[in-house]
Every structure is written in C-alpha cells, then in structure tokens.
Amino acid sequence: PPPNPEGTRQARKNRRRRWRRRQQQIRSISERILSTCLGRPAEPVHLQLPPLERLNLDCSKGTATGVGSTQIPGESCAVLGSGTKE
C-alpha cells in the first residue's frame, strides 16, 4: 500500500522516497524473473481485443456466447441486467 499521509512534511517525503525505491526493486525483481525463468519480456504483449459489439450474453443457454466466456460459473445472467436504466 502507498505510504501513510500522516507525520511531518519531511517524514512523509522520506516515506514516499522509500516506498518508490521499494516499488522499483519489486519491478526490477519481477522483470528479472519474467525474463530469466519464463523467457519472456517484462513488457506486456499487446492483446488484440474484439469490438464490444461482437460480445453478447445469451441467458437462454445458460452460458456466454461470443468471444471467450464472460459469465462466472454459477452466476445467473439476471445479475448482470440488461444495461438499461429504468
């Protein structure tokens, strides 16, 4: 979590600096793990997504249709609603 905003100005500045340094270390370690162990770059590969118009939910079948599965197993389509305001 981000640093606590309490304390003197100098204390907050030090906490932010330490927090940023810690986050940089985490990023550095994760990049190293991804590149050496998994053999892939740390940068995410751009994923081509289909247009939203092609995605739909078909509640009559009990499963989602379209590209990929968008329904949570065990969840009813009625929970999602029609998307229109009443």
Swiss-Prot record:
The modification Phosphoserine is found at S69. Keywords: AIDS, Host cytoplasm, Host nucleus, Host-virus interaction, Methylation, mRNA transport, Phosphoprotein, RNA-binding, Transport. Gene3D superfamilies: 6.10.140.630. The keyword Transport applies. InterPro entries: REV_protein. Residues 10-24 have a biased composition (Basic residues). It is found in: Host nucleus, Host nucleolus; Host cytoplasm. One of its GO terms (cellular component) is host cell nucleolus. A motif (Nuclear localization signal and RNA-binding (RRE)) lies at residues 8-24. One of its GO terms (molecular function) is DNA-binding transcription factor activity. Phosphorylated by protein kinase CK2. Presence of, and maybe binding to the N-terminus of the regulatory beta subunit of CK2 is necessary for CK2-mediated Rev's phosphorylation. A motif (Nuclear export signal and binding to XPO1) lies at residues 47-58. The keyword ATP-binding does not apply. Residues 1-25 are annotated as: Disordered. GO terms for biological process: mRNA transport. Pfam families: REV. Escorts unspliced or incompletely spliced viral pre-mRNAs (late transcripts) out of the nucleus of infected cells. These pre-mRNAs carry a recognition sequence called Rev responsive element (RRE) located in the env gene, that is not present in fully spliced viral mRNAs (early transcripts). This function is essential since most viral proteins are translated from unspliced or partially spliced pre-mRNAs which cannot exit the nucleus by the pathway used by fully processed cellular mRNAs. Rev itself is translated from a fully spliced mRNA that readily exits the nucleus. The RNA-binding motif binds to the RRE, a 240 bp stem-and-loop structure present in incompletely spliced viral pre-mRNAs. This region also contains the NLS which mediates nuclear localization via KPNB1 binding and, when the N-terminal sequence is present, nucleolar targeting. These overlapping functions prevent Rev bound to RRE from undesirable return to the nucleus. When Rev binds the RRE, the NLS becomes masked while the NES remains accessible. The leucine-rich NES mediates binding to human XPO1. Homomultimer; when bound to the RRE. Multimeric assembly is essential for activity and may involve XPO1. Binds to human KPNB1, XPO1, TNPO1, RANBP5 and IPO7. HIV-1 lineages are divided in three main groups, M (for Major), O (for Outlier), and N (for New, or Non-M, Non-O). The vast majority of strains found worldwide belong to the group M. Group O seems to be endemic to and largely confined to Cameroon and neighboring countries in West Central Africa, where these viruses represent a small minority of HIV-1 strains. The group N is represented by a limited number of isolates from Cameroonian persons. The group M is further subdivided in 9 clades or subtypes (A to D, F to H, J and K). This is Protein Rev.
